């Protein structure tokens, strides 16, 4: 009977000893909850991207600005998954909404005959970009923000726009813009 009990307990003891000898466990997070810190980092990344496009234009002209803008768009927006709900500040008529990567690129750097009114918002001589959030909503792997973005140019002039973004967190942790609405504040 004692021998039988020992045989029942021995595998449990061996299992316990085996677990103690293992390295740290592999952890898999099964939710994609986006955090406020990730959203703010994505907004700061967007501002940094805009300033990089502006600096690229100043130092290397249109070709360098376009290549930089392509990288910024590919990193920050979710066009690779389908249409993005993008309404730029200075767009109107049939070209108000930019569901495609090409439409976003034209807005940021201009130079696309399919978008003749675009002069390149991001190639202006921007020196700073700052986000002020009024609302941040976090919902699983998505987040919405609403507030203002202020841009300062080389002459020190500040332009402030009303900005609404929606962000998506991919399974690998990458945060991408799926909605971007920008407009000038009402003056009345």
Task: Identify the role of each PLM range.
Residues 1-10:
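Bacterial N-terminal signal peptides that target proteins for export
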Residues 3-4, 21, 25:
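N-terminal leader/targeting segments
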Residues 9-18:
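Bacterial N-terminal signal peptides
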Residues 23-79:
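Short, low-complexity N-terminal intrinsically disordered segments enriched in polar/charged residues
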Residues 40, 60-134:
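A solvent-exposed, acidic/Ser-Thr-rich amphipathic alpha-helical stretch
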Residues 138-146, 150, 154-188:
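Short beta-strand edge/turn micro-motifs at domain boundaries
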């Amino acid at each position: 009977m004692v021998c039988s009990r020992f045989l029942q307990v021995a595998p449990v003891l061996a299992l316990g000893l085996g677990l103690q000898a293992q390295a740290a466990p592999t952890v898999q997070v099964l939710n994609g909850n986006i955090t406020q810190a990730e959203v703010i980092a994505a907004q700061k990344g967007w501002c940094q991207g805009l300033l990089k496009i502006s600096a690229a234009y100043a130092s290397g002209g249109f070709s360098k600005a376009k290549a930089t803008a392509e990288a910024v768009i590919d990193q920050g927006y979710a066009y690779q998954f389908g249409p993005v709900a993008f309404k730029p500040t200075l767009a109107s008529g049939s070209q108000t909404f930019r569901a495609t990567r090409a439409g976003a690129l034209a807005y940021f750097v201009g130079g696309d005959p399919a978008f003749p009114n675009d002069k390149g918002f991001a190639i202006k001589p921007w020196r700073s970009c700052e986000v002020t959030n009024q609302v941040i909503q976090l919902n699983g792997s998505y987040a919405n923000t609403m507030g203002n973005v202020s841009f300062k140019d080389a002459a020190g002039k500040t332009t402030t726009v009303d900005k609404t973004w929606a962000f998506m967190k991919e399974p690998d942790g990458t945060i991408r813009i799926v909605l971007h609405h920008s407009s000038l504040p009402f003056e009345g």
